[in-house]
Amino acid sequence: MRDVTVIEADLSDAQHQTAVLYLVNAYARDPMGGGRDLPSAVCDRLIAGLRRHPTSLVFLAFDDATPVGIAVCFVGFSTFAARPLINVHDLAVVPECRGQGVGRLLLERVEAKGRELGCCKLTLEVREDNHAAQRLYQKFGFGDMPAEHGMVRNWFLQKGL
């Protein structure tokens, strides 16, 4: 990496919009993202949807002017802490830049934003077979959620609508 910078995206900026679409689609094409392009209808709705969502936060990593990584996050709320939290919904780095610290830079920026907002924690989900991402998250301090009587592994479930 020459000169990677991470910024909070301005989703009204055309360059940032292009970078978001490029990076999310690159993630979708990756085996960890499903292995195929996003449908054009999704691409058509993505930026407007993120802009309309009241708690979306998007961070972009650039190597000079080239987009190389993205973190798409949403601010939530912890009822047990009565404070906001940030969920890292998508974190992706283009294949040619993996293992070079881009993911860590994105997480550092997300963490800084969380501290700025007074968040109690960061959350994320990761595929069971995505060992590289798991190593990054563990090195960054992510772990199983604490419970009264020790550590408990949580499930992340979904139901299509």
Where on the chain are the PLM-derived regions?
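Acetyl-CoA-dependent GNAT
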Residues: 2-83, 89, 107, 113, ...
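C-terminal "cap" of GNAT-fold acetyltransferases
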Residues: 3-5, 13, 118-161
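Short coil/turn motifs at secondary-structure junctions
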Residues: 76-78, 96, 129-131
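Short coil/turn segments at alpha/beta junctions that flank glycine-rich nucleotide-binding fingerprints
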Residues: 84, 100, 116-120
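Structural detector for helix-capping/boundary residues
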Residues: 89-91, 140
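A short, internal acetyl-CoA/4′-phosphopantetheine-binding micro-motif in the GNAT/acyltransferase core
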Residues: 91-98, 127
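Conserved acyl-CoA
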Residues: 94, 105-121
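Conserved acetyl-CoA-binding loop-helix of GNAT-fold acetyltransferases
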Residues: 99-112, 135-139
